[in-house]
Swiss-Prot record:
Assigned keywords, A-Z: ATP-binding, DNA-binding, Metal-binding, Nucleotide-binding, Repressor, Transcription, Transcription regulation, Zinc, Zinc-finger
Gene that this sequence comes from: nrdR
InterPro entries: ATP-cone_dom, NrdR-like_N, RNR_NrdR-like
Organism this protein belongs to: Corynebacterium aurimucosum (strain ATCC 700975 / DSM 44827 / CIP 107346 / CN-1)
Cofactor: Zn(2+)
NCBIfam families: transcriptional regulator NrdR
Protein name: Transcriptional repressor NrdR
Amino acid sequence: MYCPFCHNEQSRVIDSRVIDSGTSIRRRRECAACKGRFTTIEKAVLSVVKRNGLAEPFSRDKLIRGVKRACQGRDVSDDALKKLAQEVEETVRSHGSSQVNANDIGLAILEPLRDLDEVAYLRFASVYKSFESADDFESEIRLMRRRDRDSF
């Protein structure tokens, strides 16, 4: 790590802390040459592999925008969406891989969204699972009711 003051590449870590719900590490460093102190933030990069094979950086904001469309007209707060996005990100990061399929993110969204708002869940699931008819909605509703019944 280069010192921002004298550009020496030797520094020592004085303090390290986990930040951003475990996705980043903040390090306080001291330059070996000039004794200047500076802070670095190291972030674990998570890439999303899309259906077409291209990879792009994971974006919590993009996830929120997608779920927000499903929640349109529903009584779902921005804070609830942020919490859901954080939960989904933690779920996909917990697999320990630096790459995740877009499909896996969609799967990780379904359960917390169902707990948040069932109508938004159905809207999201209809796009994610490519519903083609009312029968698809009916079978998904039956699955939801069965899961609710089995959870008691």
